Structure formats: C-alpha cells, structure tokens
Amino acid sequence: MQLFAFGVNHHTAPLDIREHVAFTEESMQHALHDLVGHQLVKEAAIISTCNRTEIYCNTDTPDKAVGWLADFHHLHSGDLEPYLYKLLREQAVKHAFRVASGLDSMVLGEAQILGQMKNAVKSAEQAGTLGLLLHKMFQHTFFVAKEVRTSTEIGACSVSMAAAAARLAERIFGNISEQKVLFIGAGEMIELCAAHFVAKRPVHVTVANRTVERAEALSRRFNAHPISLGELPDQLALHDIVVTSTASPLPILGKGMLERAIKLRKHRPIFIVDLAVPRDVEPEVAELDDVFLYYVDDLADIVREGLDSRQGAVTQAETIIDSNVMDFMHWVATRRSVPTIRALRDQAEQFRQHELSRAHKLLAKGEDPVKVLESLSSGLTNKFLHSPSSALNQVSNDEREQLVELVNRLYQLRYPR
C-alpha cells in the first residue's frame, strides 16, 4: 500500500470540468463507502470545494482509483485525464501540506481551506474510511499548516473570495450602501460574504435558502430578511446584488428567471457573483445585456492583489513544508519495518520461554542453580546466534562480504580488521 493523491483544481481544470466531479455533502459518505467498498483502496478521504476536488488514499492500484472517479460521476476517463494530477508517496504528502497551508489556493494563504480539509477528514472518520496512514498524514498536515501560519506572513494582506466579491460589487456600483443585496444559501461561504457586504451597510439584505430555518438563523445575525428558494422568482427583481453559493447539483437561477427580473427592473443592471461548484447560475445568463455575472474563477485577478509582497513568506513556507515531508516519510519508512521487529521480538520471546521452562525443570530436579543459570544463558546465546551464523556459513562468496557488513552493523561489532 502507498499514499496516492489525485484530482483537479483551479490550476489544472476550468470551472465546467470541476463542477462535473464535485461531491455534495449528501453524496460524500456514499462516495467514500463506494470507493473503499470496491476494494480499490484501503483508506480514503475526499476534499471537494469550489476550487478543487481531490482524493487522498492508501492503495496498491492508483489507476483503478482514478478510474473510479470518472465512473462515479458517469464520465469518460479520457475526458477527465487531461485535467488530472496524480501524486505518489512524498509528492502526495507535500501536496497535502501545501494545500492546508494555503499555498495552492487561488487566495494565497487563505485559512478557509484548512477548515475544509478538517471537515473532509471528519467525513472520512464518520464513514470509517480513515486508517492509520491517512490519519497520521492529516494530523501532520494540520501541524504543518499551523506552523506555516504562525512562522510566516503567508496570510498577511490576503484577499478572501468573500472580500473579493464585495470589492467587485463596489467597482460595479461604486457604493454598496445604496444597493439591495440577496444572498442565496446559508453555508460558510455565504456567511463570510454576508460579513463583508453588511459591513458596507447596504439598504436591504435578504437571505434565501432551501431550509428556511437556516436562512432565519443567518438573518438574525445580519439583520436580514429570510425567504425560501421558492420565493426567488418574485424576490429576484427587487435586488441589485446577488451572491449565491449553495450545494445544489443543478442551477438555481436560469436565463428565463433573470430575463423576467430584468424586465421588472426596467433594465436596471443586476450584479451576480456565483461562488458555487457546481454553478448555481446557468452560463446562458451571461448573454443578457443587463446582467453582470461573475463565477468563482473570474475573481482570480482580485484575490491575487498583494501577492508580490508575500513571495518571501512563500519561500519560508516551502522550506518548512519540505522539512516536514522528510520527517513524515521517515515515519512511513519505519512503519514498514514494524512487522519484522514484531516477528523478531516474538521469536526472542519463544526462545526465552523455552529456555526458562527447561531451567525450571532442572531446578525442580535439584540441579545446581549456578549450572542451571550457565545452561540458560548458553542456550539463549546459541539460539539467538544460530540463524545469523548459519546464514554467514551458507551464503555465496559474492554475497558474503555484504552480509558480513550487515551483521557487523546490526550487532555493532568492533574487532581488528
């Protein structure tokens, strides 16, 4: 078994590819059970965000694990192959460390990805697909991420996706305080966006969600008006800014709904930021003249602001990561010798028990205790040295020198050459 990580992210795949391999919260447990249940992998954890879908696993068949991803989403492997990255052993570990530290994010140094990785690990634990190897790797991953964030300035001056959405809205409207804002969804991303937008004091804020209770809870925090998704067709035209991020597998806002809203608004422009993957807004909506539609990838230029000033922190972070990759791979290597060490100790215990039993019998017969102890020690010595001595005598001339060096090293022998 070996560590293997594979997937797609904003570096390797466009949005229309990423949304086809995304996992919803509802499908995650089934996906994990399906992957491990087919015995393609021994352990697995899946991270699925707006910018990445990647799978970490412990497997002897990496290619079959990759094939599972395409099959699970009813895709042809050939269509997905050009966008995939596949990382084995230390490369998989380094990737995990970089992702958790925010070095692989669209928003350099962002902290949100660390929470998303922790949620992915929690899901794997709940599904029973997290074993010793992945558990140890992720624990080390979180340790490295903490060290990077506390020892470097990687997160300084970073612009989050939520902040970028607010900045973009200001560039379109100039002043958000004169606009009405509609949030669709009630998850972490919408919560972050609401904090940034509400700080600009918009005229009115509405929160729409499939579960009205969650919309109400978020509305209480931000003094907003809660509605259900079913009310969107009537409410959409009343808002100037729409920010959406749900876990819906299908679009929530279609071209027809936006056309009706624009007509009711008498063609006053409407600004929409869709941070969901899969997308909440149909791509055809971008064809409408009075709609300013931005998807998650469109925010890239804004979130890169301040990047140059943090290159020194990136170098520091990479040094920390490389050192910890070496430490973790050393732990992995030592784990491979555990069965041998255990077998060696078991054999030694058998020798001990055999000689101890023999000594007890001799003592019971009235034998001299000193002679019994000498016999016990002699018996143990002979048993412990029998195998290496036999191996040295039976080995071929070509291999003898190498074996002699190995025995000298194992037993720390010192004698004149």
UniProtKB/Swiss-Prot annotation:
Reaction catalyzed: (S)-4-amino-5-oxopentanoate + tRNA(Glu) + NADP(+) = L-glutamyl-tRNA(Glu) + NADPH + H(+)
Tell me the protein family, please: Belongs to the glutamyl-tRNA reductase family.
The miscellaneous remark of the record is: During catalysis, the active site Cys acts as a nucleophile attacking the alpha-carbonyl group of tRNA-bound glutamate with the formation of a thioester intermediate between enzyme and glutamate, and the concomitant release of tRNA(Glu). The thioester intermediate is finally reduced by direct hydride transfer from NADPH, to form the product GSA.
**Protein residues bound to NADP(+):** G185, A186, G187, E188, M189, I190
* Record: residues binding substrate: T49, C50, N51, R52, S105, E110, A111, Q112, Q116
- Subunit structure comment from the entry: Homodimer.
Domain notes for this protein: Possesses an unusual extended V-shaped dimeric structure with each monomer consisting of three distinct domains arranged along a curved 'spinal' alpha-helix. The N-terminal catalytic domain specifically recognizes the glutamate moiety of the substrate. The second domain is the NADPH-binding domain, and the third C-terminal domain is responsible for dimerization.
Task: Report the source organism.
Answer: Nitrosomonas eutropha (strain DSM 101675 / C91 / Nm57)
Q: Which gene encodes it?
A: hemA
**Highest taxon, organism lineage:** Bacteria
Q: What is this protein called?
A: Glutamyl-tRNA reductase
**Which biological pathway?**
Porphyrin-containing compound metabolism; protoporphyrin-IX biosynthesis; 5-aminolevulinate from L-glutamyl-tRNA(Glu): step 1/2
Q: Which GO terms describe its biological process?
A: protoporphyrinogen IX biosynthetic process from glutamate
What keywords were assigned to this record? NADP, Oxidoreductase, Porphyrin biosynthesis
Q: Which NCBIfam families match?
A: hemA
Q: What is its EC number?
A: 1.2.1.70
SUPFAM superfamilies cross-referenced by the UniProt entry = Glutamyl tRNA-reductase catalytic, N-terminal domain, Glutamyl tRNA-reductase dimerization domain, NAD(P)-binding Rossmann-fold domains
Its biological purpose is as follows: Catalyzes the NADPH-dependent reduction of glutamyl-tRNA(Glu) to glutamate 1-semialdehyde (GSA).
Q: Where is this site: Important for activity?
A: H95
Q: Which InterPro entries match?
A: 4pyrrol_synth_GluRdtase, 4pyrrol_synth_GluRdtase_dimer, 4pyrrol_synth_GluRdtase_N, GluRdtase_CS, GluRdtase_dimer_dom_sf, GluRdtase_N_sf, NAD(P)-bd_dom_sf, Shikm_DH/Glu-tRNA_Rdtase
UniProt keyword annotation of NADP present: yes
Tell me where the transmembrane regions lie: none
Q: Which residues form the active site?
A: C50 (nucleophile)
List the GO molecular function terms: glutamyl-tRNA reductase activity; NADP binding
